[in-house]
Amino acid sequence: MADTLPPLSLYIHTPWCVRKCPYCDFNSHEPGTHGFTPRDLPEAAYLDALLQDLDNDLNLVAGREIHTIFIGGGTPSLLSPAFYEQLLKQIEARLPFADGIEITLEANPGTTEQERFIGYRKAGINRLSLGIQSFQPDQLHALGRIHSGDEAITAVTQARQAGFSNIY
């Protein structure tokens, strides 16, 4: 039955950023304004909320395969690899993943490190959007970005070393 139904794509929003970029119109909030830091986000509560939201709409997509998942934000790379491992496992338990599913995570070069990239890859994420608008310090400052050009280059290198080949 899944072969006759149109493919399904899923967007998952992460509403937190270390700092809100002045050009960003997306729903995102700085964690400090809510009493927690970027490294102690309420992951368990957010996971429960996302799964409850999915469960509420499962009847609308019954029998369909997910072909793509895009995790945007905000800054999804603020959440741990363990969070995404659980999230993806729970989604797949509810809806089948197509062979060759593409799972994208937006990541800010200022919030990543080698271990996180390795963990994201192990969790099932196979595509990264690194959000590198520039390598020039003056442009990065004007854009309100939290990373430097060197950090952007390091992030690409670390992502490749972690096994990511689909990076943009």
PLM region descriptions:
Residues 28-60, 65-168:
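Conserved non-cysteine loop/helix-boundary elements of the Radical SAM core domain that shape
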